[in-house]
Amino acid sequence: DYCSIWKLNLNVKKCKVIIFSRGKVRNIPDFFIGCEKLEVVTDFLYLGLKLNYNNKMFVAQKDLCERASRAMFALLKKSNELMLPVDLVVDLFDKTVLPILTYGCEVWGHEMVEAVTKLQLKFYKFVLKLRLSTPSVMVFGELGKFPVTVSIKARMLSFWMKLCSPLNSNKLSFVVYKCLLNLYFTDRHKNRFLS
């Protein structure tokens, strides 16, 4: 009805439905646009983040790690072909692979981030031609780098400060955050981001 009023045409092949729930939904209702049935999916790629029906960000992290891993190996291959110095390769990693790895971390950074740090260390050890058993502290010290989790936590705090800012009190994100906070403090909603 809305589409016909505003004369909008939707591509039904690109429209998907995802039902967010704690467990898998057994009785899936049918969704239609006009007389065309929409597909119900468990995962959906939205703005570069893979959303999962159970609202866990593990699926998004895994997807980002896979993409970053492909970029990392492409960078390693090219840097070996061109015989680039270590400092340049590390700088290229920071500028090309880390943005893929940390994309949307303000949202998923409160979940397990071991896989992200593991990929970062794997790259550094490859570049320095070290064994995988080399202590992580030595690798970070040698390169003068911090674990990517430090950057993730800083970005999360920055996002949270913007979210809580009174300047944003008329924005929907601020209102939703306040509602979630109220539910959290009355023990009606549990959320790792709020705790």
Give a label for each model feature.
Residues 1-4, 20-24, 53-57:
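Catalytic palm subdomain of template-directed nucleic-acid polymerases
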Residues 3, 7-10, 17, 48, ...:
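Mobile genetic element proteins and their domesticated derivatives, centered on retroelements
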Residues 8-42:
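Short, conserved micro-motifs composed of acidic
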Residues 13, 87-88, 104-110, 133-141, ...:
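Short coil/turn segments at secondary-structure boundaries
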Residues 13-23, 113-121, 137-146:
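A glycine-rich phosphate-binding loop feature that marks nucleotide/adenosyl-phosphate handling sites
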Residues 35-108, 170-171:
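Basic, alpha-helical interaction scaffolds
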Residues 68, 93, 116-127, 156:
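Short amphipathic alpha-helical coiled-coil/interface segments
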Residues 94, 119, 132-195:
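Extended C-terminal regions of large enzymes
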